[in-house]
Amino acid sequence: MTHPQPFIAVIPARLASTRLPNKPLADLGGKPMVVRVAERAREAGAQQVLIASDAQSVLDAARDHGFEAVLTRADHPSGTDRLAEVAATFGWSDDTVVVNVQGDEPLIDPVLVRDVASHLAAHPDCAIATAAHPIHDAADVFNPNVVKVALDARNVAMYFSRAPIPWSRDAYLPHWPDVSAMPAPAFPVHRHIGLYAYRARFLRTYPSLAQAPVEQAEQLEQLRAMWHGERIAVLITEHAPEAGIDTPADLARVQALFRPGSK
């Protein structure tokens, strides 16, 4: 019998949001969104669930619902930087697996959270694990808001991009630049899922890594790690996860799911 990989779940929760202010505290069936996310992380089997925020109101909401919370600085440029501060505060051992569960994904599948943690443990040569799923629609391939990942033979990431990668020259070039005429991909194309597991030793080094030109160009923080030589193992799942909450319309959609009697 195999035992689940022990891991710690950290939920970065930033109160300031241009599109949806006070997002972590948005009500979902009588509980704040960040608490709903923490419940999912607990269902995944995390040994410890931490909510990390620069806002006292978020910490209070977490503690009111029985979750551990830690105050972090307000000037972090990314969720990974916030996790790095938490890792330094708690002094976790080098091989501790830390999963970054996004604070705006109250419908995240606990099984996926657990599987990404286990995937990192199964790849000792990688500092990070994440997930991706196949996409079959040309509109997704060419959508810059859909992040794609190119993989090697071991499903280790070669590159992440908002551009259509891999580029199928023979299929796409005859139609370029008419994106609407592009055929569906006839080869594997994978959409990145923004769920990460890290080794604590990597988190301690992350803040000292200079930002990479490709990271700044693509606005994808995982490219900083790759730029500095770290490897990212990618777990392939066949199904897309539930979408996170970025806009008032997203919030209304998810709030409806938490109403009594909804399925």
From Swiss-Prot:
One of its GO terms (molecular function) is 3-deoxy-manno-octulosonate cytidylyltransferase activity. The keyword Phosphoprotein does not apply. InterPro entries: Cytidylyl_trans, KdsB, Nucleotide-diphossugar_trans. It catalyses: 3-deoxy-alpha-D-manno-oct-2-ulosonate + CTP = CMP-3-deoxy-beta-D-manno-octulosonate + diphosphate. Pathway: Nucleotide-sugar biosynthesis; CMP-3-deoxy-D-manno-octulosonate biosynthesis; CMP-3-deoxy-D-manno-octulosonate from 3-deoxy-D-manno-octulosonate and CTP: step 1/1; Bacterial outer membrane biogenesis; lipopolysaccharide biosynthesis. One of its GO terms (cellular component) is cytosol. Its EC number is 2.7.7.38. The keyword Cytoplasm applies. It is an enzyme of class 2 (transferase). GO terms for biological process: CMP-keto-3-deoxy-D-manno-octulosonic acid biosynthetic process; lipopolysaccharide biosynthetic process. Keywords: Cytoplasm, Lipopolysaccharide biosynthesis, Nucleotidyltransferase, Transferase. It is found in: Cytoplasm. PANTHER family: 3-DEOXY-MANNO-OCTULOSONATE CYTIDYLYLTRANSFERASE (PTHR42866), 3-DEOXY-MANNO-OCTULOSONATE CYTIDYLYLTRANSFERASE, MITOCHONDRIAL (PTHR42866:SF2). Belongs to the KdsB family. Activates KDO (a required 8-carbon sugar) for incorporation into bacterial lipopolysaccharide in Gram-negative bacteria. This is 3-deoxy-manno-octulosonate cytidylyltransferase 1. It comes from Burkholderia ambifaria (strain ATCC BAA-244 / DSM 16087 / CCUG 44356 / LMG 19182 / AMMD). The gene is kdsB1.
